[in-house]
């Protein structure tokens, strides 16, 4: 079993020789802008998106923290339960956060979500898909 929430990887670690080769060929004196743009273009092409619709980061935590900082002023809205870092990063940047509570079977009714959006008027709504911790995949 791979515990993705613990950042476990199904891949074997690189060998010392592989790491040495990677480090030897890395250009540490330049920002990796060219590689980043190539990655975005390739990812966008694969998913039939525009590169402007793609942002990459050093894991989901970095991107969640950035969202909490750059989104318009106002509360965030998230599912409850869901990934605990939504609340942690909202608290870190003093952003209010409200929640849509799960039904007893850990599912979320779309009407309840829409009603909560209407009530809270959040700056943005954030959710994990598949849902954490139930693993339910939502068709968006």
Explain the meaning of each model-derived region.
Residues 80, 99-103:
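Short beta->alpha connector loops at strand-helix junctions that form conserved
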């Amino acid at each position: 079993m791979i515990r993705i929430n613990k950042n476990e990887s199904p891949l074997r670690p690189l060998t010392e020789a592989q790491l040495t080769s990677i480090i030897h060929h890395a250009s540490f004196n330049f920002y990796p802008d060219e590689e980043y743009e190539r990655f975005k273009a390739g990812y966008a092409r694969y998913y039939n998106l525009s590169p402007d619709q793609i942002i990459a980061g050093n894991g989901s935590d970095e991107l969640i923290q950035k969202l909490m900082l750059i989104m318009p002023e106002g509360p965030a809205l998230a599912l409850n339960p869901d990934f605990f870092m939504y609340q942690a990063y909202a608290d870190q940047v003093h952003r209010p956060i409200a929640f849509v509570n799960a039904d007893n079977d850990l599912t979320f009714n779309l009407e309840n979500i829409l009603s909560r959006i209407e009530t809270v008027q959040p700056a943005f709504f954030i959710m994990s898909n598949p849902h954490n911790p139930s693993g339910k995949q939502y068709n968006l």
